[in-house]
């Protein structure tokens, strides 16, 4: 039998004695017994963290005691009472206060207590809550930290006091010396002073003259002193000091806000999640909590101390000494470094934890706290990443207004240099985790949730509004008109493109997103993209005329469900081209990489993942490149820093092309290079692919077994694989060895019942078939001859040749080759002909399961049905042709292939792949950045010349020819933006119009035309003006004319609103004008024109109008409440957090406030340089800039459908109605003079 636990009973009785006399809380409570479930009244005494209970108040010996360490206390409802005849007793019991003490150990029964008064119960609960030794330790630690800080401050003050004492002593000595000098001078003057007559003998006129002179001297001195003071006030030094003080005040406000954000992070998330991790069924482990919130609490304590120091410095204003505060902050930077290095892992752990529904539900409860103001946890985790760059900007501004001889200058410069070192790391981490935070933000907007966005390898590409066209059976489009309002309203979809999936959502009135029940999440690997449905689908022929060639089709063939079609309508051709480029590139990244993997796995000892891993240039840092831990959409580490040459090399690396790298490069290339250099690199890749591609890439591109013997003796890690192409193949290809040979392949259908694949055999004629020994086709087999003369360059091989070498081990390679070609060209066959020539039993649904998931079906091209079997050729896509050629060159050649022919095969692969890459990059460039070619005619002509040269290539594949022709047509056609209204057109139309008065215009008319003007000006800003912070330079009008025009228009509109209000002489008219303008601002909000809202609210907040108390007294309460709501929406608080959230929850068209994005760009530009000290491009910074430009262009590309009204526009653009700021204030003083002090 186990012995009972022994304890020091004598000491326990002594503690009970102390509890009866000095206990924290004492009194009678009713205790529920565990055996009979009855209540007994006991006298309880709480001493520290031990609860004693006695039989009565006079009892000396306790009846029992409870250890309260690690327990919790909570109120419980009154237990139900049985019995109908005891109503009075039950009511009395229900009025009592019940609470329970819960112990952490499982199986430990809780202590149930009750008391008669609620106040007494609350006091008992509060006392039990505070009876924790662990909490006292935490408080003690906090106090110790504060004590250490105060000791440091006291020591600093002692040193300062000692210095002041020495200064006072020196000054006393100086005063004594000066006094002695004065005495000596006075004695000298007395000796030199001549005899003076008595003052009484002085003439009265002389006395008056002296008084006047004395008065004049005093007046001149005061005038001179006033001039000196005014000169100093207007001097650059005083202006600098004023700006410096303003910077410090702003810094204190920002620090206060930041400390509040950290407080919410710690108290609203960290501590509650720690408690949840200690529960019986924890939704999250303690390790995960520590990983997510590493050093968060310490950072909060650090900044609380820093904030208190700032406030103490402000109390000593106008003397502001800040350098010692930063000296306190600098030693703590290692804490920040740990937080920064953990940031990406933190967000990845958070994304993984969100897959747990219990944790996700709990997190949503925490985020619903009003203190969070709708912000998510990952937002709070990112705030510390922005704080150090904000300090750097503040120090830059302080140093700009701090004289060189200032006592603080060296200290501030040292602090800035230390912070900049950490800031570079922070910007890199923020850039690397931008994608995870974007995915989590979108996932939180979707009401149903979306688990695929919790995959941290998923990369966001683009979003926008598209119209989903309803369809009926067999994919026939409903007869709807493009201008149908019902179609736009009911069919509008918010679409999100990721590297692996395509999301289609509807947006509710509250701004939340809902995934479509059918086809809401499309896996791109199951999708076929048809860019011109009228050209590829007979059922939808003529839809191009109905929809103006703005529609495109996505055919989805999921492996476990029936196929279906999604038809989407873009708002413009340029928008459609951009969507097409991105979707096709994402599908390429998935399928072509998978296709290359299959081909190399079947025909080589080196697979594509190993091929990429074995290339150290793709993942190991070097003198001219540095990588981050994050992988891009092609599973290759993202570039953090790189030279221009390495960036161009990555752009033209034929093994892969990451869509996120391509978009970032095209957005920001003009920061570190020119369009001519980029085009020159593309031209070199096309004309001289072997000399333009690094030798190492070529070696790994063809890293396969060299011969039959090598296949059995050399493994994938042999150095021979790396030495195979130590020098590039010859560039010149003679016509005799040209890969244009009469060679055909027969595609056999239907499916073989055993292997589930189509039999593809080589033959010298369409009627001669060489059967595979592994599987022979059924008797009723239709064959589709495919002309692959441009895809393969091996000489013809007769059936006899294969039969003679049946016993040769190379037959296995040939069989692998045939299987690879089957997978590569399966979708390249004309679908209509395959259906005609195949067996009736083999329909499309039977063919779907055997399609290789890595086959690029989105580039499928169908020949017209009128062609015969003799002259019909398969139009192989570039990716398919590349796979076929790679499969052909990837293994040892059959007997009869000489070295020259093998070289031609490999050269053909490189040329076709290089052509495909050049066309792909040009397609993205032309479709997404048409302004580059509109503003640079020389660049446009060079691209046209290159495309014409590509089209003259006799070996060009049909699909490549079509792609080049499409790019050529896009460049040659007139500017598509001509259909849009421009500001110059509006001004020209309003020149001869008669001016309208404010009273004759309705609020709706004003709001619509303000929105139209704001959007026209905002849309006209070319993206290159957002680069390089040109709007802050001295030559800003030349470098960023459109941004300055937008800023000027904002100021003119704000001045117009203020001027119109001040034009009224009586109070009621001014109040009515204010109410009308507030109504205009509210309509602008409904139209998603937040720039217009800010134009009007900023005008109403001007001092000239805000001070008119009598006028505002006449304004209705409803208008004032609406004004407050609008101001809160566009407030700059928290980096425009409310405006950002509002923009996130609205569909374009919308007009954001441009200053918000310019602030973000300035923050990035000033935080980190474009180039490192080694001269490498800071590509992490380029990625952050690209994300902001992408968001701006999202709002630029969707236009409003508002009719232009010249009369209203003429009023809004009339400069004669605008009164300058000084005149406005003078007019305001005349209307309502200042009250006497």
Curated annotation (Swiss-Prot):
Residues 1099-1128 are annotated as: Responsible of the affinity for farnesylated versus geranylgeranylated Ras. Widely expressed with higher expression in brain, followed by heart, lung, pancreas and kidney. Detected in placenta. Expressed in brain and lung (at protein level). It is found in: Cytoplasm; Cell membrane; Endoplasmic reticulum membrane. Functions as a calcium-regulated nucleotide exchange factor activating both Ras and RAC1 through the exchange of bound GDP for GTP. Preferentially activates HRAS in vivo compared to RRAS based on their different types of prenylation. Functions in synaptic plasticity by contributing to the induction of long term potentiation. Residues 635-756 form the N-terminal Ras-GEF domain. Residues 205-234 form the IQ domain. Phosphorylated by CDK5; down-regulates RASGRF2-mediated RAC1 activation. The gene is RASGRF2. Residues 791-800, 841-855 have a biased composition (Polar residues). Residues 243-429 form the DH domain. The Ras-GEF domain and the N-terminal Ras-GEF domain form a Ras-binding site and mediate Ras activation. The IQ domain mediates the calcium-dependent interaction with calmodulin but is dispensable for the Ras-GEF activity. Residues 744-752 are annotated as: Regulates proteasomal degradation. Residues 155-193 form a coiled coil. This is Ras-specific guanine nucleotide-releasing factor 2. Transmembrane segments: none annotated. Pfam families: PH, RasGEF, RasGEF_N, RhoGEF. It is a peripheral membrane protein. Changing residue 114 to H: In a colorectal cancer sample; somatic mutation. The lineage of its organism: Eukaryota, Metazoa, Chordata, Craniata, Vertebrata. Keywords: Calcium, Calmodulin-binding, Cell membrane, Coiled coil, Cytoplasm, Endoplasmic reticulum, Guanine-nucleotide releasing factor, Membrane, Phosphoprotein, Repeat, Ubl conjugation. GO terms for molecular function: calmodulin binding; guanyl-nucleotide exchange factor activity. It comes from the Eukaryota.
